[in-house]
A protein has these predicted regions:
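A structural signal for well-ordered alpha-helical segments within the folded catalytic domains
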Residues: 75-76, 120-127, 169, 173
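A short, conserved alpha-helix in the catalytic core of glycosyltransferases
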Residues: 51, 57-62, 67-97
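Short, hinge-like loop/turn segments at secondary-structure boundaries
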Residues: 20-26, 106-109
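Short, flexible, basic/aromatic active-site loop/helix in glycosyltransferases
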Residues: 7-8, 24-44
Length: 183
């Protein structure tokens, strides 16, 4: 049962392709073919942009959480779909040139190692991630990989960004307010 099909994402700034993510792996990310099909891959997550979801699947899995807008709304929905036994498929038959985050001169951002959003957006990212850590349908592999990554990125933004105070305020507020989100 397929819940959604999403395009191959290419960063227009770096022309780097984003691999389709499998969170049951603790290190590395690679494309794994879907039932041996060429150009179609298993994924544990597809970004909302360009992804096709049949309405009957939305009826079964439920809609995307409005209170997660603007960050990780797709991540949370994909986790629910996978927990209900659905497959997510990434395809090379559709390409989407899509930059995630803001432009920056920092080499880590330019290289695509990390995405840097505006300080205001980090509130939503922090809140929603911390909320997802408490969900039983969020894969353990994702939690084990994402929590240290989130912590390191938050520290980097709060210590080394030119807007570190704004980042610190938004990240810490997001962490505090994660408890206030509905189940």
């Amino acid at each position: 049962r397929v819940a959604a099909v999403g395009p191959r994402i290419i960063n227009p700034q770096t022309l780097k392709q984003t691999p389709f993510k499998l969170f049951n792996r603790l290190v590395g990310r690679s494309n794994r073919r879907y039932h041996g099909l060429r150009g179609e891959y298993q994924a544990d997550f597809l970004i909302t942009s360009g992804t096709l979801i049949p309405l009957n699947v939305v009826d079964s899995v439920g809609p995307m959480r409005e209170d997660y807008f603007i960050d990780n709304i797709d991540l949370e929905w994909c986790f629910r779909a996978k927990a209900r036994g659905y497959d997510l498929i990434g395809t090379d038959a559709a390409l989407l040139y899509h930059a995630i985050g803001e432009r920056s001169d920092h080499p880590w951002v330019r290289s695509g190692l990390i995405a840097q959003h505006k300080p205001e957006r980090t509130f939503y990212s922090s809140r929603n991630r911390v909320h997802l850590y408490g969900k039983d349908y969020a894969p353990l592999g994702w939690k084990l990989r994402d929590l240290p990554r989130f912590a390191l990125k938050a520290i980097w933004l709060m210590l080394f960004s030119p807007h570190r105070r704004d980042y610190a305020r938004n990240i810490l507020r997001g962490i505090r307010e994660a408890r206030g989100l509905a189940s």
